[in-house]
UniProtKB/Swiss-Prot annotation:
GO cellular component, one term: plasma membrane
Domain of life: Bacteria
Keyword Membrane in annotation: yes
Organism: Halothiobacillus neapolitanus (strain ATCC 23641 / c2) (Thiobacillus neapolitanus)
Gene: dabB1
The protein's name in its UniProt record: Probable inorganic carbon transporter subunit DabB1
Keywords assigned: Cell inner membrane, Cell membrane, Membrane, Transmembrane, Transmembrane helix, Transport
Length: 559
């Protein structure tokens, strides 16, 4: 197991070295060498995961014999290594043809291999120093990959923007590592986490170390995972090559969720920080989802979609559902990587048409005409509201009867209910001669998905965090006052149902308030289309700082 763990980050590093050595001799054929070693990396990562599960192994720590330079083999590192290696291999294969006409072809694969090695080192790092080195290298490699086209000024500008944001995100993690080392005297994760569990209330300079470190780690994750208001770099990195966008949105941007899970033994003692994670994640999810709706560029729309999904991932951590955040991370990585790699084909196909999708969905949303409903709306509405909730409750109760004793689980159930209802509400645009059969097929598919997701979710939770006491402690730390919690859930449910009812009235060309809020809607659309002016505010602040530095420079010359 030890040798396999070291092979996983070393194979991409070896690939980068071979690409550099043989680029002049092999030319563009050097890409096949990179793909071959990438395939071997996937095989080794898969074998390690299977071996870990099959032998019922326990987490192990392996060092080179120094204080740093160690790897940690546990469920989180094992499964993340396979996911990262797999996505990297897909991007490598896709890039062979996509980048063939671009300048710097061998250099691109060299950087891609170095990026893969950095991410694999991060997910397998066994101590604070190794983690910081890998964390820093990811930002550097991403800067060079985004600026692959050196002749494009927007690419260089937004690559530097990303680089600065990532450097700002590095600083809190460095401070957290220093605080943890100064307080507990250890940098390797097994020793560090055991000492934190033994003395979670330790302080340094009058500050609670665990809470302060968790807060700093959260700030670092916010910058890396594009949480509001540190999100502006993500949608503007689309000037880079599409394979880089796929790797970034499928793997690199997920680093925030990984780092929070890696420091779960710290967050379990930080109730207030978990609540902050939930609030920031919820705001990011809402802002990202709303901004996505007003974009007319497919890659930028996918970028804001990623922002929203990262918000959901951080929100799940804030609820104490750390394992679900990892599951979300993996599913989103595979899904979003596929969407980015296929975005070019979608643009190509769209050019063959007039750009107007002549279907009932377009008629309902854009032309504001009534959608034809074959069944009474009241029946459909009741079935849509009740059936998903019933299926979710039964599935979770069957798998884990104590599931509903945790507030975080209730919130997850709430969002699952909203998602299921949204799926059923969206089926009005499907073309089916028999609407009853269509509805039954949708309900059956939804049931299978939910039940499968429930079983997989609970099994995944038991795999990542096998200690039931630790899982319960995470949920307990994320809890709030029961009366406040019940009131918030009830209020949110009322708001959601009111929104659905407004959608129904809009589909009937009616409105509760008539046209009195037409100007408000137009203003709101303008605000959203300008992305809430956050990027403009940052530009203005940058100009203010530049002007202030110039004045300060002139003032210093006089003295």
């Amino acid at each position: 197991m030890m040798n396999l763990q070291w092979l996983i980050p070393l194979l991409p590093l070896l690939s980068a070295l071979l690409v550099q050595l043989f680029a002049a001799r092999l030319g563009k054929r050097v890409a096949h060498l990179s793909v071959a070693l990438g395939t071997l990396t996937v095989i080794v990562a898969a074998y390690q995961l299977v071996a870990y599960i099959g032998t019922d192994a326990s987490p192990s720590w392996h060092s080179l014999g120094t204080m740093w330079g160690s790897l940690y083999v546990d469920p989180l590192s094992s499964i993340m290594s396979l996911v990262v290696a797999g996505i990297s291999l897909i991007v490598h294969v896709y890039s062979i043809r996509y980048m063939t006409e671009e300048p710097g072809y061998p250099r691109f694969f060299l950087l891609l291999d170095l990026m893969t090695a950095s991410i694999l080192l991060m997910v397998a790092a066994g101590d604070l120093v190794t983690l910081l080195i890998a964390w820093h290298m990811i930002g550097i490699m991403l800067y060079f990959l985004l600026g692959q086209n050196t002749e494009s000024w927007p690419s260089q500008r937004y690559a530097f923007w990303t680089f600065i944001t990532y450097r700002l995100g590095d600083l809190p993690l460095v401070l957290a590592a220093v605080l943890l080392y100064q307080t507990y005297g250890a940098i390797d994760f097994p020793t560090l986490f055991s000492r934190i569990a033994a003395d979670p209330n330790a302080t340094i300079m009058g500050l609670p170390t665990a809470i302060t470190a968790a807060f700093l780690v959260a700030l670092s994750a916010f910058a890396k995972s594009a949480q509001f208001p540190l999100h502006t770099w993500l949608p503007y990195t689309m000037e880079g090559p599409t394979p880089v966008s796929a790797l970034m949105h499928a793997g690199i941007v997920n680093a925030g969720g990984f780092i929070i899970n890696r420091f779960a033994p710290v967050f379990v003692h930080s109730d207030g920080v978990l609540h902050m994670l939930f609030v920031v994640g919820l705001i990011t999810a809402l802002v990202g989802s709303v901004l996505m709706l007003t974009q007319n560029d497919i890659k930028k729309s996918l970028g804001y979609s990623t922002m929203g999904q990262m918000g959901f991932m951080v929100m799940e951590c804030g609820l104490g559902a750390f394992s679900l955040a990892v599951f979300h991370l993996i599913a989103h990585g595979l899904f979003k990587g596929t969407m980015f790699l296929g975005s070019g084909s979608m643009i190509h196909e769209a050019r063959k048409h007039d750009g107007v999708p002549h279907n009932p969905l377009h008629t309902f949303l854009v032309e504001r005409k009534s959608a034809s409903l074959k069944l009474p709306w009241l029946f459909i509405g009741l079935a849509t509201l009740v059936v998903p909730l019933f299926i979710l409750v039964i599935a979770h109760w069957f798998v884990a009867p104590d599931f509903f004793e945790k507030q975080g689980a209730i919130v997850l159930l709430f969002f699952g209910w909203i998602t299921g209802v949204q799926v059923l509400f969206a089926t009005h645009h499907l073309d089916a001669n028999n609407p009853i059969r269509m509805m039954m097929m949708i309900l059956l598919s939804f049931t299978l998905i939910v039940v499968g997701y429930t079983f997989i979710g609970h099994a995944f939770e038991n795999f990542l965090y096998p200690e039931e006491a630790f899982r319960n402690a995470l949920y307990h730390a994320a809890g709030i006052d029961k009366l406040t919690f019940d009131g918030l859930v009830f209020l949110l449910a009322l708001i959601v149902v009111a929104g659905w009812f407004s959608s129904y009235l809009a589909s009937r060309e009616k409105s509760v308030f008539g046209d009195r809020f037409g100007a408000v809607r137009l203003t709101l659309y303008s605000l959203i289309s300008r992305e809430f002016y956050v990027a403009d505010l940052y530009d203005r602040m940058a100009h203010w700082l530049l002007d202030a530095s110039k004045r300060f420079n002139v003032w210093m010359r006089w003295y």
